[in-house]
């Protein structure tokens, strides 16, 4: 019974091997995340008499190299939430924080929780790629929002309110009508220096060239508003260059977002649960792949409560003696990215209002009872996850074993 505790960090790790009753098999030692050092660690673990189990914290992405390589070498690996390790064995007044002390603490945790350790399952390459793409998608969405706000801030000094003229959705290449419009009519003087007829003709030709819908009344509305606007920055080459650069940055981020959205949908469609997930209300070609990416393989969850705890939308419990709190906040100790995706799904359900959907009925019921926004949204996310778990697991069980 050998507990291998590994304190993982970037590029290197600290390893300690202990046995019950405080027996030290190997004092803490450092290894690099290289093939030579990892192979040496594998040989060392195999050489120790008795059953060995490796425990490490799943911190960021650093642990994945060791967890993957050790699992492939037929070594039992368990990855633990850092919060559980931090709260374990805090029975000393001294505060010791070092890699060696942490490795030994993780090994003691492994010994104490030996029977309850869950083995790390190798995520197949497709799911790993999908999850990585989703994290990149989230990063570029934040970047796109920042670029959009930056452009609007500049345009407020040259053509205030131009971003509100059109509400058409983004195209498949990420382009938007208001951004393309602002790229051509980047200053209010670009419009009002022309006559109404000249602007209408110019705007119509631009719509035809860009394949946008043209409306004469819209052109007249734009021209009328331009006459009343007061710009701050002058209409010169410096201002034009500033706006053109901001437009290029926004278009670049938007294009990347749409490419990732399409690629994620194509990748998710290769997974077995794709059709049953896409058939659920509130889920489309954007949110569907995000859900699949963040939840991963449903079969690794033993029951419905496990998947809600993984997302951090499970209801909390606060009881002591005769006291029992009725309304307890959720744990929020799970995946923040998954919770964000679930809230987006709930938002879609509220906007589309599918009357025959059980999750929407539940949301509408809680909302009609006067529950606060976050209460009924979180409760709806919990119910959605439970239904997701049941439907997907049942569907996967019905498939031939080869799939």
Language model: regions and residue ranges:
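A detector of single, family-specific signature residues
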Residues: 1-403
């Amino acid at each position: 019974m050998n507990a291998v505790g590994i304190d993982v960090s970037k590029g290197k790790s600290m390893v300690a091997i202990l046995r019950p009753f405080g027996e030290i098999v190997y004092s803490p030692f450092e290894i690099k995340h290289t093939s030579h050092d990892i192979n040496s660690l594998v040989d060392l673990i195999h050489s120790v008499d008795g059953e060995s189990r490796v425990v490490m914290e799943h911190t960021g992405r650093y642990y994945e190299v060791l967890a993957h390589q050790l699992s492939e070498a037929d070594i039992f690996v368990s990855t633990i939430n850092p919060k559980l390790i931090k709260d374990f064995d805090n029975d000393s007044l001294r505060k010791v924080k070092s890699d060696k002390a942490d490795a030994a603490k993780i090994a003691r945790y492994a010994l104490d929780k030996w029977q309850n350790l869950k083995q790390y399952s190798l995520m197949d390459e497709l799911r790993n790629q999908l999850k990585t793409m989703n994290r990149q998608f989230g990063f570029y969405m934040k970047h796109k929002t920042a670029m959009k706000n930056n452009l609007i801030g500049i345009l407020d000094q040259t053509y205030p309110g131009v971003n509100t003229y059109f509400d058409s959705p983004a195209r498949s290449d990420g382009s938007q009508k208001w951004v393309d419009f602002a790229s051509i009519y980047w200053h209010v003087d670009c419009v009002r220096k022309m006559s109404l007829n000249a602007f209408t003709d110019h705007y119509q030709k631009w719509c035809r060239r860009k394949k946008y819908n043209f409306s004469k009344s819209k052109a007249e509305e734009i021209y009328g508003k331009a006459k009343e606007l007061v710009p701050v920055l002058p209409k010169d080459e410096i201002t034009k260059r500033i706006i053109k650069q901001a437009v290029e940055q926004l278009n670049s981020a938007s294009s990347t977002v749409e490419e990732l959205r399409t690629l994620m949908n194509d990748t998710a469609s290769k997974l077995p649960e794709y059709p049953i997930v896409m058939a659920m209300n509130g889920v489309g070609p954007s949110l569907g792949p995000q859900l699949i990416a963040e939840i991963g393989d449903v079969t690794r969850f033993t029951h419905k409560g496990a998947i809600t705890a993984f997302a951090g939308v499970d209801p909390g419990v606060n009881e002591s003696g005769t006291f029992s709190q009725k309304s307890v906040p959720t744990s929020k100790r799970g995946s923040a990215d998954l919770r964000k995706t679930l809230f987006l799904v709930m938002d879609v359900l509220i906007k589309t209002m599918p009357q025959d959907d059980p999750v929407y009925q539940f949301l509408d019921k809680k909302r009609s009872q006067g529950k606060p926004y976050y209460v009924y949204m979180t409760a709806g996310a919990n119910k959605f996850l439970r239904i997701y778990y049941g439907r997907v697991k049942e569907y996967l069980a019905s498939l031939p074993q080869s799939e």
